[in-house]
Structures are given as structure tokens and as C-alpha cells.
């Protein structure tokens, strides 16, 4: 059996049994190494060698958590939440409440999508924006599984179809380049997003299904410090609001300039400190709260990097892709389906759709040409196979990001309330729409 398939299946089974994700990743990595014939020592060494790859992201999450706590202390998030609650209180009818609910969802989609291209900060905004809005979600009785689906949609769909920001990297720098390198020299940049429109429609279908069918019923959460918006008026320090705005601008500007979430969050935090929002003696407590809020996400990222390192070391990814080409026969529809399913397994094993393309394109492009798939169909196959698994993977930042914000009060479970809903609503439609694209383009 292929070690990647075994490892991914073991990881998913353990995670679904509510075993801690870090434990599930570590154990399944060891299982994969042993299945591949590696010694226990070599497997552990490969796992440990990969841990450093997740350290940067883990520290980024810790700093973002600290920055989020600092923002909440300024009162700017209370101001934002109260403005929404004020609108809600003035409109008690069911129709008005429903309208406001959909307005909030649309706003979240737009903000999340803009984080991929307009202001390319990726998931950095989630731990900052979402925790203060938990009170609004509770007031509107929004199911957080729906919010997770909305956020994941906004994180993935833009890079699949829009060639700007992270989409420019995915579609042009990685997908187009690897298509050229593996035999599709005549494909031009304008064809790539066009070919990905139908798979992108699958993402839209999944989002609409989540909003109007799966999670349309109201859901109530326990009252906590984060889910209760205090409606009693108290004076808001205007200077603190100004400092908060400057801190957010500073964090964003520094991150875009340096390319580092760590330095960006640090710059924003220092603005809050020098601006008087946080006293010097409180900095330790604020940092501790921020790290506590983001610690589990950070450790999952570190363990995921180790897991990916073992998967690459086993050689199982290449073997899995190559075995596909020898087992299909002449069945074109089956070939398209199996290519997508293998892409799903590889992306869930590696944890990054961006890293999956070079692995898949090496075999998929010649295989697609041999089966007579058109260049547009080949683009759709490779692009969709890579994007598959980004949603619904326990170790993907497209699921860890939403959980980091929604679980700020401990009422949102990563596997059953982010991973499983996004897997069902996005991976299944992506397979269906990706397969249709391969057949009709």
C-alpha cells in the first residue's frame, strides 16, 4: 500500500475520533514512514527536520493573537460590534434580521476575498477581525460552521480564478509555469483563469449550499465574555480608537513591505504600547493571552510541517501519481476522476495546494495529452487537483485560519466544525465540477 494514502487515512480517522490533531499528525507520519520501509530513527529524523518549516507560521500566529488582544483592549472592536447590534435592535422583524445576517455574510466574503488580492495578508486578518464579532454572530444566531465555510470560500476561490495577489502566484507563477515545463508550451496566461471558472463555480455552489441549506437554521452558543456585547453605554476613549487605527495601518503596511506577519504584528503592537493603549507593565499579560489563544493552531502548523516532510521523504507522493498512469487503461472519464482524487490525497498529505502543482504536473500533463484532453481541460484538471484538499484538510491554513478566530471562546471544534463542513461543501463539488470541466472543455 502507498504510504501517503495510509498516512492520510490514519490521520483523518484519528482526527475524526477527536484525537488531538497534533497527536494524529505525529502518529500518522510515523506510520507512513514505517510503511514506506524507513526505520523508526529515519522517520523521526525526517519528521523533526520538517518541524522548523512550521515555526515561522506558528510564531506568526502567536504575534497575531497578541495583536488581536491589543486591538480588543482599544475598544475599536466594541465600537464595531455595537454598531451592528444597534442596527439589529432597531429592526426586530424577522425579515430585517435575516437581511442583516446576509449582509454580514456578504461582508465577510468580500473581506476574506480581498485578503487574497486587494490587500494580500492571507489569513492574518482572521484572528484580529473574527473574535470581536463573535458577539454579533451570537446575536444573529449564526452557525459558526457556516462562518467557517464562508471564510474558507474567500481564502480559496480567489486564487483559483483571479490572477492577482495570491492568485497571480498560483495561476501564473506556479500552474502556468509547470504546464509549460511539462509539455503545454502553447498555453497562454489568459487561458488559465478561464479554464478554472467551472471549478470555481463548484466553490460557489458549495457556499450557497452551506448558506441556504446546511446551516440556515439558527444556532445558539453559551454566553461568554466574547459572545456578549454589552449594550450599556460607556465612554470610548477616542485617542485609543485613533491609536488602534494607526496600529492596524502600521501592521498592514509593515507586513506588505517586509512580507512578514511576525514583523507586521510586532509593529502594530508597538504602536499600541507607545500610544498608551497598553501599559508597559501589561505587555507580558497581553502577550500571554495572545499566545494562549493561538497556541494550538501554531502547534498544528509545526506538526503539519513535520508530517509533510515525512511524506516527501517516503517517495510515496511520486509513486502514487505514477501508479495512476499505469492503472487507468483507456477510460477517459475514469482517468479524470482518479486524477482529481489523487490530487485530493496529495494536497491533504502535503497541506498546501501551491506545493502540490509541481508534483502533479510532471505526470498529469503528459497523461492528459495521452488521453486526448484539450489544453483547457488539462489546465482545469491540474489546477483543480491541486486546489482539492486545501479545504477540508486538518493541517491547511485555509481551515486553521477560520478555526483560530471562531474558537477564540472555546466553542468551535476544529475537525467537526471546520474541517468536515468545508470538506463536504467544497471538495465534493470541486471533484464534480472539475470532472465536468475536464469532460467539456
Curated annotation (Swiss-Prot):
Tagged with keyword Manganese: no
Transmembrane segments: 21-41, 51-71, 94-114, 118-138, 150-170, 195-215, 239-259, 260-280, 291-311, 334-354, 363-383, 419-439
GO cellular component terms listed in the entry, alphabetical order: plasma membrane
Pfam families documented for this protein: Na_H_antiport_2 (PF13726), Na_H_antiporter (PF03553)
Localization per Swiss-Prot or TrEMBL: Cell membrane
Record key words, sorted: Cell membrane, Membrane, Transmembrane, Transmembrane helix
Membrane topology: Multi-pass membrane protein
PANTHER family in UniProt: AMINO ACID TRANSPORTER YUIF-RELATED (PTHR37821:SF1)
Name of the protein in question: Uncharacterized membrane protein VP2115
Species this chain originates from: Vibrio parahaemolyticus serotype O3:K6 (strain RIMD 2210633)
Amino acid at each position: 500500500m502507498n504510504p501517503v494514502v495510509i498516512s492520510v487515512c490514519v490521520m483523518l480517522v484519528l482526527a475524526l475520533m477527536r484525537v488531538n490533531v497534533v497527536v494524529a499528525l505525529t502518529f500518522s507520519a510515523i506510520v507512513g514512514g514505517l510503511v514506506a520501509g524507513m526505520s523508526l530513527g529515519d522517520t523521526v529524523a525526517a519528521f523533526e527536520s520538517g518541524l522548523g518549516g512550521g515555526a515561522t507560521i506558528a510564531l506568526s500566529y502567536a504575534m497575531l493573537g497578541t495583536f488581536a488582544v491589543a486591538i480588543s483592549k482599544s475598544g475599536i472592536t466594541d465600537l464595531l460590534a455595537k454598531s451592528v447590534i444597534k442596527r439589529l435592535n432597531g429592526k426586530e422583524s424577522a425579515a430585517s434580521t435575516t437581511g442583516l445576517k446576509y449582509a454580514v455574510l456578504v461582508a465577510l466574503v468580500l473581506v476574506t476575498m480581498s485578503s487574497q488580492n486587494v490587500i494580500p495578508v492571507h489569513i492574518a486578518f482572521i484572528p484580529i477581525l473574527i473574535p470581536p464579532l463573535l458577539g454579533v454572530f451570537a446575536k444573529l444566531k449564526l452557525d459558526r460552521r457556516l462562518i467557517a465555510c464562508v471564510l474558507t470560500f474567500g481564502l480559496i476561490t480567489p486564487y483559483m480564478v483571479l490572477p492577482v495577489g495570491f492568485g497571480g502566484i498560483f495561476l501564473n507563477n506556479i500552474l502556468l509555469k509547470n504546464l509549460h515545463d511539462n509539455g503545454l508550451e502553447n498555453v497562454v496566461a489568459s487561458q488559465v483563469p478561464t479554464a478554472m471558472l467551472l471549478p470555481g463555480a463548484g466553490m460557489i455552489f458549495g457556499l450557497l449550499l452551506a448558506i441556504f441549506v446546511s446551516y440556515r437554521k439558527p444556532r445558539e452558543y453559551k454566553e461568554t465574555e466574547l459572545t456578549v456585547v454589552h449594550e450599556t453605554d460607556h465612554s470610548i476613549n477616542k485617542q485609543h480608537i485613533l491609536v488602534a487605527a494607526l496600529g492596524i495601518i502600521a501592521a498592514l503596511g509593515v507586513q506588505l513591505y517586509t512580507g512578514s506577519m511576525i514583523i507586521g504584528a510586532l509593529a502594530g503592537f508597538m504602536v499600541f504600547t507607545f500610544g498608551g493603549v497598553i501599559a508597559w507593565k501589561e505587555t507580558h499579560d497581553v502577550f500571554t493571552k495572545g499566545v494562549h489563544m493561538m497556541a494550538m493552531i501554531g502547534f498544528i502548523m509545526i506538526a503539519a510541517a513535520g508530517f509533510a516532510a515525512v511524506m516527501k521523504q517516503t517517495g510515496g507522493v511520486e509513486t502514487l501519481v505514477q501508479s495512476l498512469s499505469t492503472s487507468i487503461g483507456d477510460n477517459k472519464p475514469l482517468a479524470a476522476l482518479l486524477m482529481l482524487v489523487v490530487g485530493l490525497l496529495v494536497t491533504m498529505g502535503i497541506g498546501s495546494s501551491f506545493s502540490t502543482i509541481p508534483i502533479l504536473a510532471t505526470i498529469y500533463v503528459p497523461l492528459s495529452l495521452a488521453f486526448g484532453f484539450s489544453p483547457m481541460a488539462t489546465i482545469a484538471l491540474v489546477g483543480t487537483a491541486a486546489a482539492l484538499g486545501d479545504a477540508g484538510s486538518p493541517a491547511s491554513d485555509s481551515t486553521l485560519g477560520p478555526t483560530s478566530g471562531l474558537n477564540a471562546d472555546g466553542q468551535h471544534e476544529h475537525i467537526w466544525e471546520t474541517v468536515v463542513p468545508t470538506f463536504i461543501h467544497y471538495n465534493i463539488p470541486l471533484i464534480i465540477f472539475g470532472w465536468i470541466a475536464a469532460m467539456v472543455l
